[in-house]
């Protein structure tokens, strides 16, 4: 299934990409370009936990507040005009979002996309960018993080866990508030058990790789240079997530499982998981380990309840 809304810039060919992808994979196509479901938005400013919670900056409000947007090939283009309640209804109808968390935009992020400073690692864990105290968008990021933690819980009803990752400066030490590019390690993409992470310079990249590996044990963390002088992707205010958002699957397997915390080795405990597939699920097994270097346990067959 593909969902297409309208991009918030005059890029008509970009707007048609979802339709070509849907045709190539023979997938259903849902388009939010006609009233009352017309919605303007950007993939970099939307994340979902897959369980009904979505995140965006308040850019989504500006993009759908009415008024002149730009002059297109067929004449003037206007922003859709929606209230917050109407936007929430569209997000629920097309994206399955029941809780829509909106955060303030950042003053030094020119595109106001949340993927430039945060990443959902799982349903309970937020990877959040970090600046030195008082630098660039650091104060607003901290305020946004406290807003989320104070007002929302994860889909499992637990407080969000937070992993911090430093945002690197330029070679000369500049951050976005002093004309440095918006370098970020949160603009990453999951591809099965691999995570593609934007890289810049070794002295900072090694720290980012360690943080990802500790937060996502068992995943293969692959860095991609986006700050190369020959092909400087980050200079265009984006990195890997900005140009991909996600890599879908034609027949996805959904496994939702809350992590088990503080499990004493001599105690028994219950493992719960929601497992879904288009063809159904006949059996499921649990493999566990306390040390990836020693491998996994023999399989334990789960009971369908």
For each feature predicted by the language model, list its residue ranges:
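Glycan-association/targeting regions that enable binding to alpha-glucans and other polysaccharides
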Residues: 247-305
